[in-house]
């Protein structure tokens, strides 16, 4: 007796014997196929790609022969990408400035058993981050005396940096050589000027 796939219920079986001439009486019995909890089946999830410092959400789906309520669990193979599930929506959030790839594993659970895991790759593409210039305190210099400052900045991408500067007044000229900023007041000038520096 071979029940159909996922069938549960009862069936009546009638059995007779025959000697090729006459048949016996018929024996009837009932077969009961008891239900078992079927494992949910999680739908495949495509690989995903996002830019650095962005999040992404994907919708999850699964089937369950028993019609059980499905919940989902997800995990990342790196602490640089966090996973969070609300209902059937999976949200993935990389940490700030992370780029690279993460393998995400997802399972569906029907309250009793887990599905086979589905894995996919989340690729986080790098973007060029703006450098951060170290703050410069207000400066003073005697009349007719140039002043040279050493500039400093950081860049999470490790790029080579150049500097530029602009003076708010023609009475103070600025020049940049490497990371050195030289401020040269005009002859006999005294007063103030605002210097804007960028990296």
Give the location of each predicted region.
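Acidic, turn/loop-rich segments in luminal/extracellular domains of secretory-pathway
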Residues: 1-38, 46-71, 75-129, 137-199
């Amino acid at each position: 007796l071979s029940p159909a796939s996922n069938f549960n219920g009862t069936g009546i079986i009638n059995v007779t014997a025959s000697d090729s001439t006459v048949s016996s009486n018929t024996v009837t019995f009932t077969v009961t196929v008891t239900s078992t909890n079927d494992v949910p089946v999680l739908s495949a999830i495509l690989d995903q790609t996002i830019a650095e410092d962005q999040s992404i959400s994907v919708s999850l789906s699964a089937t369950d022969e028993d019609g059980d309520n499905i919940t989902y669990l997800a995990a990342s193979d790196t602490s640089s990408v966090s996973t969070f599930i609300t209902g059937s929506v999976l949200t993935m959030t990389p940490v700030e400035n992370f780029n690279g790839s993460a393998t995400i594993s997802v399972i569906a659970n029907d309250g009793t058993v887990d599905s086979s895991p589905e894995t996919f790759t989340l690729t986080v593409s790098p973007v060029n981050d703006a450098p951060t210039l170290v703050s410069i305190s207000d400066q003073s210099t005697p009349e007719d005396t140039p002043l040279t400052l050493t500039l400093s900045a950081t860049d999470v991408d490790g790029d080579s940096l150049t500097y530029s500067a602009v003076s708010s007044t023609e009475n103070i000229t600025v020049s940049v050589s490497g990371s050195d900023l030289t401020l040269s007041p005009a002859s006999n000038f005294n007063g103030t000027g605002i210097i804007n520096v960028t990296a």
